[in-house]
């Protein structure tokens, strides 16, 4: 009941309460270089990342699948991975530079519930790039499993009104 009272008058443009900064979460993530480039813009978080690695595979863009070019895409990835291995033996620090935006890295991300609201508002919105949107939706789903009331109104800007109607039908 407390969270319903706290969120009763919230609007899509409102910041959530600062008290939610006391609720921390830690996520172990694997993501593409493209996704990481967007995620690291969220400064109210701690990100600890490993190097990109062919051993983590790649993220296949839906646009490549939509035009039926997965085979060609993966052939280029195979060539890239071969170049990576050649360079890695001579200059390990230079090898990651040959990898693509589709290659993945592991990331530990620590953030608080208030920042997760902010991340969800921007990155789970239908206008967000598909890769960061998918990652953000998975993070939000996992966090909601643990604290459903705390994150009851966390969603993309485009989904706020529908979510509000679910929890506050008379408002």
Annotated model-derived regions:
Residues 1-171:
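A conserved ligand/cofactor-binding region detector
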């Amino acid at each position: 009941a407390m969270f319903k009272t706290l969120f009763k008058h919230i609007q899509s443009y409102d910041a959530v309460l600062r008290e939610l900064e006391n609720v921390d979460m830690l996520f172990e993530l694997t993501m593409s270089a493209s996704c990481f480039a967007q995620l690291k813009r969220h400064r109210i978080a701690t990100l600890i990342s490993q190097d990109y690695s062919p051993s983590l595979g790649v993220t296949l863009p839906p646009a490549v699948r939509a035009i039926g070019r997965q085979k060609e895409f993966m052939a280029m990835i195979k060539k890239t991975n071969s170049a990576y291995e050649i360079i890695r033996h001579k200059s390990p620090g230079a090898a990651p530079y040959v990898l693509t935006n589709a290659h993945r890295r592991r990331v530990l991300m620590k953030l608080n519930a208030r920042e997760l609201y902010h991340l969800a508002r921007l990155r789970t919105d239908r206008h967000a790039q598909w890769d960061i949107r998918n990652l953000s939706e998975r993070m939000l789903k996992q966090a909601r499993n643990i604290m459903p009331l705390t994150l009851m109104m966390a969603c993309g800007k485009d989904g706020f009104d529908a979510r509000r109607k679910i929890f506050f039908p008379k408002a």
